Amino acid sequence: VSGCNEEEYDRVARRLIKEIREESPKRLILLDGLDVGSRPLMTVRDIPHIAQCGRGYQPMLISHYAASWVYGDKPMYFHKEKLSWPLEADGKRYDRDFLLNTLKDAWKPWTDQGGLLFVGEFGAHNQTPHDVTLRWLADLLGVFKELGIGWALWNMSGSFGIMDSGRKDVAYEDFHGHK
């Protein structure tokens, strides 16, 4: 959730959770984190059977490389030859430790109190070089495992997916009509 304050989000979330609970009292409910899933909504820690959803798109330069919609009609620019994982950019080093610390620091207040975290959205755009994507994903999935975080890719099929992604740097096999 982006663009609303915590009080507003809490009020709406509680109302929706109340309605769901009337139909299914023990259902696990996934609640999107604040600021596009980058941090927890701590005010709901008193509600049983919920998990909050984070994102796994850091750094955006890797996950959304050359995605036209990120900065309006101009895709983010970075020399493709310099795109790597680990990555040095803007005077910073992006590596496994960066991924670990970014997730752990943002969600520690929630998980330290027993809150469940599920990264319900992550992946790399088809313009990110395949070898870079694989190294980044290996580190990211390792961090999820280390922190005990459940996960789901943004999509199975499409520009962030593992099938029908339109990548030009992968030799595809046919799988039931998909590549």
Residue ranges and their predicted role:
Residues P129-K179:
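Aromatic-rich peripheral "rim/lid" segments of glycoside hydrolase catalytic domains that contact
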Residues E6-R14, R96-L100, D131-L134, A138:
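Non-membrane alpha-helical structural segments and their capping/turn regions in soluble enzymes
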Residues F78, F98, F118, F122, ...:
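Phenylalanine-focused residue identity feature
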Residues V1-R93, K104-A124, E146-I149:
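Active-site region of glycoside hydrolase catalytic domains
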